[in-house]
Amino acid sequence: MDRVRFKASGPPLRGWLLLATVTVGLLAQSVLGGVKKLDVPCGGRDCSGGCQCYPEKGARGQPGAVGPQGYNGPPGLQGFPGLQGRKGDKGERGVPGPTGPKGDVGARGVSGFPGADGIPGHPGQGGPRGRPGYDGCNGTRGDAGPQGPSGSGGFPGLPGPQGPKGQKGEPYALSKEDRDKYRGEPGEPGLVGYQGPPGRPGPIGQMGPMGAPGRPGPPGPPGPKGQPGNRGLGFYGQKGEKGDIGQPGPNGIPSDITLVGPTTSTIHPDLYKGEKGDEGEQGIPGVISKGEEGIMGFPGIRGFPGLDGEKGVVGQKGSRGLDGFQGPSGPRGPKGERGEQGPPGPSVYSPHPSLAKGARGDPGFQGAHGEPGSRGEPGEPGTAGPPGPSVGDEDSMRGLPGEMGPKGFSGEPGSPARYLGPPGADGRPGPQGVPGPAGPPGPDGFLFGLKGSEGRVGYPGPSGFPGTRGQKGWKGEAGDCQCGQVIGGLPGLPGPKGFPGVNGELGKKGDQGDPGLHGIPGFPGFKGAPGVAGAPGPKGIKGDSRTITTKGERGQPGIPGVHGMKGDDGVPGRDGLDGFPGLPGPPGDGIKGPPGDAGLPGVPGTKGFPGDIGPPGQGLPGPKGERGFPGDAGLPGPPGFPGPPGPPGTPGQRDCDTGVKRPIGGGQQVVVQPGCIEGPTGSPGQPGPPGPTGAKGVRGMPGFPGASGEQGLKGFPGDPGREGFPGPPGFMGPRGSKGTTGLPGPDGPPGPIGLPGPAGPPGDRGIPGEVLGAQPGTRGDAGLPGQPGLKGLPGETGAPGFRGSQGMPGMPGLKGQPGFPGPSGQPGQSGPPGQHGFPGTPGREGPLGQPGSPGLGGLPGDRGEPGDPGVPGPVGMKGLSGDRGDAGMSGERGHPGSPGFKGMAGMPGIPGQKGDRGSPGMDGFQGMLGLKGRQGFPGTKGEAGFFGVPGLKGLPGEPGVKGNRGDRGPPGPPPLILPGMKDIKGEKGDEGPMGLKGYLGLKGIQGMPGVPGVSGFPGLPGRPGFIKGVKGDIGVPGTPGLPGFPGVSGPPGITGFPGFTGSRGEKGTPGVAGVFGETGPTGDFGDIGDTVDLPGSPGLKGERGITGIPGLKGFFGEKGAAGDIGFPGITGMAGAQGSPGLKGQTGFPGLTGLQGPQGEPGRIGIPGDKGDFGWPGVPGLPGFPGIRGISGLHGLPGTKGFPGSPGVDAHGDPGFPGPTGDRGDRGEANTLPGPVGVPGQKGERGTPGERGPAGSPGLQGFPGISPPSNISGSPGDVGAPGIFGLQGYQGPPGPPGPNALPGIKGDEGSSGAAGFPGQKGWVGDPGPQGQPGVLGLPGEKGPKGEQGFMGNTGPSGAVGDRGPKGPKGDQGFPGAPGSMGSPGIPGIPQKIAVQPGTLGPQGRRGLPGALGEIGPQGPPGDPGFRGAPGKAGPQGRGGVSAVPGFRGDQGPMGHQGPVGQEGEPGRPGSPGLPGMPGRSVSIGYLLVKHSQTDQEPMCPVGMNKLWSGYSLLYFEGQEKAHNQDLGLAGSCLARFSTMPFLYCNPGDVCYYASRNDKSYWLSTTAPLPMMPVAEEEIKPYISRCSVCEAPAVAIAVHSQDTSIPHCPAGWRSLWIGYSFLMHTAAGDEGGGQSLVSPGSCLEDFRATPFIECNGGRGTCHYFANKYSFWLTTIPEQNFQSTPSADTLKAGLIRTHISRCQVCMKNL
């Protein structure tokens, strides 16, 4: 309570002083009661009666001896949370979050560097796409790309066991800012520590509180008038010299005042004090209140005497003050008379320490023996001191103790005090009391007393009387008990020293105490014992009369004497006793001192409760610790997954007859004597404790198959497999049933007499034929299932099905074979001893036992071999250097981590060496229609390329336009009928000449299909169609034969049955190249031949035929009208070639027939002559999208292009809309591609087809390197034949597209692959009945007449046998499209399973199919090879002037081409691209390239490498940094050392690796090491560099944006990167890069792009004090916004780093 102050507010309160005294005394009791037990109501007090009075506590005794060390207490309760600290610094990178969802497809990367300029070719118009070339050789393996950025850390592992304490780290003094940055959060209160060993005796404690007031001394004589003193305590005297630093004072009582700081929290007095917290921020001014009185410091030097103050009001007696210095004795005053014994004065409570010295206390306990001090000399008498310091108000004088007042009344219970009240006014001085009893022991004195003045020899004083026992105090009233629910608090702080107790009974005289320690000189004591005889004093004042006078009145108290002068320092006193521990002091603010020596080891504490798992620390991983002791056995883990069954063990064998146990199972075995009999098996032991997880076992043998489980649910259908190759041809099917009698046919012209054929057996009756007007029947039943086909190619793996439902448990499997012996279990507890059994006979060798159940894990085994290196952990903050640990055990392989986030686009790699020619890339997307180019120069004809892979099957074409009807021929002469002619079928006659064009006749009745006619010669090439034909079957690819002679179009023959497979023809010789001819006019279409709807098997691959000569130009013939009815003849011999018939009359238009079957493919014509150059055509239709390319490699990011020149709006002339054909049938699926024919003659311009819908885009091809150029390349060589393409899937037919604009005439395309025969079309409607013919006599063979009108259907003849294979007929012209007929009647399916026939011969090339609708784009096929070069197009118009590209690499030397014809002079071309940088006289610029990997970088194209080395960033010597410009050659040291320099002093002495100097190097992307790396381990972390000789200076340009900046005009790019500005490391030293230097543009971005190497230690490491500074992205509004603070985590950093490009001037 002596720390509570009251300040009287003025005179009105003085009257309440007595009441305040009592009240405060009671309050003190209630307050002090706060430390009592409060966990029961009323703190355990009996509140039923009145308040019990507790006697006042006596003075504190001497400290007892140090007790024995106590036991470890239990862990303390968790303390209350400490105050909220200031906001911490930015934390390190957090633990990676869970893998996010897959991000959207990122933006397309920047374009790669432009390649080197090629040698300009002759400008020519691009030919059509050539055939694909063969695959090129695989390229050489490129240089390794730059190391990717470090992957994000894995998920935090489980906390490992507590490692041993690491070695003490190196001290590092942080600056104040760094201390603030790295200051940790206040820790939790620690556990109670062990009792330490007794410490050394501490320094003498501070002066204790004052004792009770002693009796007042006799008044001294008035001293001489002092010099004017300061006015009371209110004014300050002259500043004294700085005193010695006092010891820290004890802590004040905790206050309940809430201090409002930056963070608002209430300070509770009962909280444990935590460790020293961080330095708080500047608080706002607190509540103004007077603080506690500090402990009096060491005395200052003596001040000047103050002026006399006015007499103050008599103040209340203050508490005893600190003893002042020993003043000199004043002049002796007149002797007073002895006063009467006064009554004992009352105990006075004063809130202030008393200044009066108490009476001598009881002897203290035996103190420790100190060194005997030297005896001091008697001091001189001092002069009278100045008035002592007043206590309380300025003008009050110190009063004497008052008498004990009467007992006051009980006051009202006061409300609990929240704040300290003001001090009360000083009371008036009471009358002097009698000497009090002995006070409590005085405080320990200071170590060094002040030397007193030499004193005068005093007289012996009388012995004091024993004091009487004090009177008993009054019993107080019972206190109010507040019996509310009281929560037990923590132990309170030690209470203040209590008031002095009432005088007790006189004790016995104590033993002589040891001499006390020297204390600070006190006030003058009572008269001492007789001293040593002093020197004679001066003559005294005349004494009183010897006569007895009346007793004088007690004199007034004398004025306090003037302060004496400061005496000399006294002899050091003995050490005082240890004081009690002080209250915790306030947090100090000194700088953290160096670590002290290690203390003695404490007693091991009890195991604390496990703390919560803390968050992962942020230090760098510490070194690998020593191997720890085996940990306690953990709780049993969950049962592991059953391992695979082991292989059967070898059977054990017990040989009791030999006395030896064979080591079958391995290990040392005991000897069994002959006649041994094993005892019965003991009961199983108790399970042993589980062992640690064993190492991963070797893979066991596969177990036996278990019982089949229930069938799972059907999975989702897989992707359709590729179509298989055609099966072998089936057996010939049975002959069809005989048809019904048909309508009579028209009499044909008599044929030549045929050779007699063998008589065929009569055929069965056929199915009724079609009757005019009959409706088609319903669809027949489905046929029987065919034989299983051959196994198809495996389909693509389907998507995984859903997980099936849990199957029913299977039946118990068969008993498995015994497995390997299980691991040894823990030894079981001993079972009870069995009874002694009889000895058994030796057993036979038993069968192999079943495997034992796996034993529980054993105890920790011996130390294993070092495990595999673990996965590198995330980079933490630097940890303290730990003890070097043993290698830990190998951990089990973890589960694969979740997929990481999609990384940012990596930095472009270093340009590798030019690789070998790679495989051709896939076609890119169809580009937009370009502008019409200028006419180019004719290119030189390229060499013949290889044949390409056949393309995919085309989509069905639309039906062609019906041709005009041909002329009617003249009637032939009657045939000469010879005997036997009607019995013999004649052979087919020769082909007649082409008839004249007839008029259009009426459409005849649909006749029955005739027997197959002889194939005609191939017709001339038709005009190229714009629309794809019907997708034909894929034949076996043959090598393309040379085109045959063109035949004239014969009349349509009847399609024969499929022929047998022909043998492969011989390979023809290639024809000579024709001269350039003019484009011939388009030939007429021939008649379309009928086909029998039996599809032929795919033919074998034929050899390449001889090149045919160009066919004659045919007339545009049509189907002739029916001739006059000839005499009926039998089939005659082949007649001579007839002359052309007369032109027939025009017939009526026939009915539209159904779409006929697809004709056989025609032969491939020879290439026509090259036409003259035409004028530029109108723009062509957009091509179909190309097939999907394989994924290209990621190109280097390109530079941002310049804005292109504005294009010319040029639309072609609108074309005529083409007719919309009927929708064709869906073609059969292609199996193998046919051979590519030679190009046909150039056809006339076809009518444009309808525009198909846009196909789905193919996959993205390789990004092309497209330097702008307006010069077309020359046509390439003809490629070699391609390999067979795989069959694509059939795409569904698409809807008809809108009418397209007319396209320009395209270049002549290559002939398409030969198609298979189409499917049989529907039977057309029957034509009108013809006139009946008369039977004629057999005539001689006349000339072949034109085909007559269809006659009536004749009676059905017998079905003839299959005739021999006829000769190949001519190719017919495309027929007119028929109208859709009504469906035919369904055939009766034969119920026989037909074997597939053998592979038939390759059919002839069919006619162009009808125009089908454009189907949707099928799935992308495999990439094709390079096509043959197209013809040179006409010269294009001059292109727009292009931006100069960059210089590319020089291509390889081309082959010598043939001498081309002289082309027409072209228009002047645009300026060419800049050439290679030439060697100049002034060459000698240096360029440094840093790879930021451990691979040497390549110099840019055209530059020589001068040397390569290691990328030096800067040095640090004598704590100063010396920076290197990364763009200059000095940053590329040829050799690496952690200490590449030494230092020399002026004394001609140099030192190497003797200081803490450092070197800093650009680093690689190698994973951050846990510990500093040394020697060879350093190499993967140091970036390599090359110094190149450049023809011009290189500069860096920075975009201050995320986009790549452009090089200035006339400069080319060398590399792109990130804008590196500066760096700092140890000691806040560092450097920076000039932003114009290439060193400021690093190709790769890292948060820490360099590593620190310590020269003295020879190690390198990434320490936490490295900072890199980069230019950031700045929005365009430069002055319109204030930068906003932001923290970027990993993954977002590159979005705020400026990009840059290093450019070199083109010379």
Swiss-Prot record:
Triple-helical region: annotated segments: 184-1479
Sites where a glycan is attached: N138, N1270
Domain of life of the source: Eukaryota
Biased composition (Gly residues): 121-130, 148-157, 852-861
Propeptide positions: 26-183
Disulfide bonding pattern of the chain: C1499-C1588, C1532-C1585, C1544-C1550, C1607-C1703, C1641-C1700, C1653-C1660
InterPro entries: Collagen, Collagen_IV_NC, Collagen_IV_NC_sf, Collagen_superfamily, CTDL_fold
Keyword Glycoprotein: yes
SUPFAM superfamilies per the UniProt record, alphabetical: C-type lectin-like
Post-translational modification: Prolines at the third position of the tripeptide repeating unit (G-X-Y) are hydroxylated in some or all of the chains.
Region: Disordered, residue numbers: 60-253, 266-476, 524-900, 1195-1476
Function: Type IV collagen is the major structural component of glomerular basement membranes (GBM), forming a 'chicken-wire' meshwork together with laminins, proteoglycans and entactin/nidogen.
Entry similarity comment: Belongs to the type IV collagen family.
Name under which the protein is recorded: Collagen alpha-2(IV) chain
Species this chain originates from: Mus musculus (Mouse)
Taxonomic lineage of the native organism: Eukaryota, Metazoa, Chordata, Craniata, Vertebrata
